[in-house]
Amino acid sequence: MKSSVAQIKPSSGHDRRENLNSYQRNSSPEDRYEEQERSPRDRDYFDYSRSDYEHSRRGRSYDSSMESRNRDREKRRERERDTDRKRSRKSPSPGRRNPETSVTQSSSAQDEPATKKKKDELDPLLTRTGGAYIPPAKLRMMQEQITDKNSLAYQRMSWEALKKSINGLINKVNISNISIIIQELLQENIVRGRGLLSRSVLQAQSASPIFTHVYAALVAIINSKFPQIGELILKRLILNFRKGYRRNDKQLCLTASKFVAHLINQNVAHEVLCLEMLTLLLERPTDDSVEVAIGFLKECGLKLTQVSPRGINAIFERLRNILHESEIDKRVQYMIEVMFAVRKDGFKDHPIILEGLDLVEEDDQFTHMLPLEDDYNPEDVLNVFKMDPNFMENEEKYKAIKKEILDEGDTDSNTDQDAGSSEEDEEEEEEEGEEDEEGQKVTIHDKTEINLVSFRRTIYLAIQSSLDFEECAHKLLKMEFPESQTKELCNMILDCCAQQRTYEKFFGLLAGRFCMLKKEYMESFEGIFKEQYDTIHRLETNKLRNVAKMFAHLLYTDSLPWSVLECIKLSEETTTSSSRIFVKIFFQELCEYMGLPKLNARLKDETLQPFFEGLLPRDNPRNTRFAINFFTSIGLGGLTDELREHLKNTPKVIVAQKPDVEQNKSSPSSSSSASSSSESDSSDSDSDSSDSSSESSSEESDSSSISSHSSASANDVRKKGHGKTRSKEVDKLIRNQQTNDRKQKERRQEHGHQETRTERERRSEKHRDQNSSGSNWRDPITKYTSDKDVPSERNNYSRVANDRDQEMHIDLENKHGDPKKKRGERRNSFSENEKHTHRIKDSENFRRKDRSKSKEMNRKHSGSRSDEDRYQNGAERRWEKSSRYSEQSRESKKNQDRRREKSPAKQK
């Protein structure tokens, strides 16, 4: 295939020299200067290189060269005659000039100052380049002064604004924002500024060829709506390629051919243009032409393989011949070999259209059939401002076109996912229309949620395209969606926030703005908070963190009421690992926003306490303890001060409430439950029973004949109350119990328990005989401790025997006593004991301190003792162990007695 560009034949050097000499003799210096300044197009591009001349001469015969020389000689003579005629018309010789012309010239010279003044008075806006820089304030003032929109000044300003906006948008385009740039570009009148658009696209592509695929996609979208703009860009591209080929400008050929290749991939240009360009480049192969052809073939080779396999086979066959026959550089030979390897791999590294740029359907695209060798008008006049007498009419026409295109684009984006169901929708609409004609009303319920999907997509695009939350809120409110979609909008804001890698304050501010604007948004976010907390286990950790931080922001700014925390109930049963993580991040974020003092004050607000009952539970000590441990573990222990006080005061409150409960309940089940609760309250101080029992036995030695049940109740009280604190209330309690015990003793003496007493005396005597061996070494210790007045544990060892005797008495009397009387006595003793348990428990801390002090004194004393003292100390340890074992046996017997009393046989 031969193009018109390749049909230019060079002439001989001798003819050139003759013509040049004759021309120089006949022409003046001014004419020669004009000829040098003339463009290559006027000279018909005769400055070919010697290598091209040799290549053209190599394949032609002598006859054909002679014919071509004669033709060139004739053409040159004709051209010289034309130039001489033009020169004679424009600049006649001085002798031929008329005197009238000289007179007119002198008069025009006199009028020059006046014309200069007129030029100086021109408006800077009307100059070709827009004039000097005008400050924005002055420019706005000048625009306000212009009232006639059809005036020249207004059209000039709108032209300059159009040029700036088109250049800015073209320079900003990339793969990610191409859809947004297209929408903004269509807002401008690109029909009026199509020359500016074409020039901007070509300049941007030549400056950055790496983004050629992006510019090609942009041109493809514009071509689908305005085919004349795509045709203009393609014409200018072809002319640029031909210009670069004639000038041997490799860089211009590379950029232009690459752009053409991508336009062919986008179906803007036909594949015939590609084959013509490749044929031209490989017809007379040089290193540069082969390199341009290979680069061009890489970009559009896969497309040519699909649409024209015979054509691409011919191109590769030509490359193979060049590789074997032509004398080209090694680098170019290697490039040809690489090209064959790329073809063998199926052009896998050079796809037709990159992902994200296939934005136009094949049916919507308009393909231009523009051959390479035709003459095209680049329409450069479109690049320059020209006044339009019908300016406002054309603007209104473009507004109508723009509205149609943008509305069509919105419907296309909404129907991308439901393209398959479009026919069904049309059938349903037809059926609905027929039924309406018959007079029947039919309601169609859409179960596919197509409208919901399109609504969510619209919101997502609005959020992602906004720079700040105020702009986003303005865009969303401008959509004017129905009130039924309010909650869906709030859900979409939360979902967008959860999808981010890290929490962005943008979403918290956006949600807060909507909550402040309308009550419905606030109620929607309240419901979403409860739903999210109930289903928080479905979220990943990253999404959970973002959701918690967003809701913390809403509560901190008081966009949401704090009553939403009512749904949070802290306990081991009602929480999961996900909900605990949510509460942890939520409160840590609140503490970071507000500070611990303000957060604590808000949680102590009396008006909000009903909503914090689940968050700070006080109904059950177990839940209270769980909440305290939870907040302490997350570093917010300062929020649990009141819970700790409540947990300390809980036993006192329970003890104060139980006597009233016992008076109201008369059933045996209520009495047994009250006794079990009192026993559970007294079980906290069982660890100190050994010390308290020894002291109680020494003080109550005169009441050794007291009944078993009364002594047991007294021992329980003394176990709780004895310590280093000798308060008056405890003394009064002991005296009252002693009097009650004596009365009970007198009653029981009437019944007579002679046998139990004799057995008790025998056992006590045996016990004393067994312990008599240790009295010799126990005396000096007691003497030493009595002199020093140190309350240590060794002072109590001498009382162990008496305590054991009394405990044996209690066990025997419990075995043979009347169970009915025992239950009555227990009720009385329990009611009295429960009144003072809250007072007696206060002394436990003091007893612990005293025991620690006594142990320290024992350690100091044991360090200074001799070997004999160490032996005695070992004996004391043995006695201590025996006392522990005896106490354990006593406790087990007591438990057995209690079980017998609670058994149904005993109650009957």
UniProtKB/Swiss-Prot annotation:
Subcellular location: Nucleus; Nucleus speckle
GO biological process, alphabetically ordered: mRNA splicing, via spliceosome; regulation of mRNA splicing, via spliceosome
Positions bearing Phosphoserine: S39, S61, S107, S786, S829
Domain MI: from-to ranges: 454-570
Compositionally biased residues, Low complexity: 666-680, 703-714
Pfam family, one: MA3
Ranges of biased composition (kind: Polar residues): 1-10, 100-110
Disulfide pairings: none
Domain MIF4G: start-end pairs: 163-346
Segments of this protein annotated with the region Disordered: 1-129, 404-443, 654-908
A GO MF label: RNA binding
Subunit-structure text: Component of the pre-catalytic spliceosome B and the catalytic spliceosome C complexes. Component of the minor spliceosome, which splices U12-type introns. Interacts with EIF4A3 and PRPF19 in an RNA-independent manner. Direct interaction with EIF4A3 is mediated by the MIF4G domain. Full interaction with EIF4A3 occurs only when EIF4A3 is not part of the EJC and prevents EIF4A3 binding to RNA.
Function: Required for pre-mRNA splicing as component of the spliceosome. As a component of the minor spliceosome, involved in the splicing of U12-type introns in pre-mRNAs. Promotes exon-junction complex (EJC) assembly. Hinders EIF4A3 from non-specifically binding RNA and escorts it to the splicing machinery to promote EJC assembly on mature mRNAs. Through its role in EJC assembly, required for nonsense-mediated mRNA decay.
Family designation: Belongs to the CWC22 family.
Name listed for the protein in its UniProt record: Pre-mRNA-splicing factor CWC22 homolog
The species this protein was found in: Homo sapiens
Lineage: Eukaryota, Metazoa, Chordata, Craniata, Vertebrata
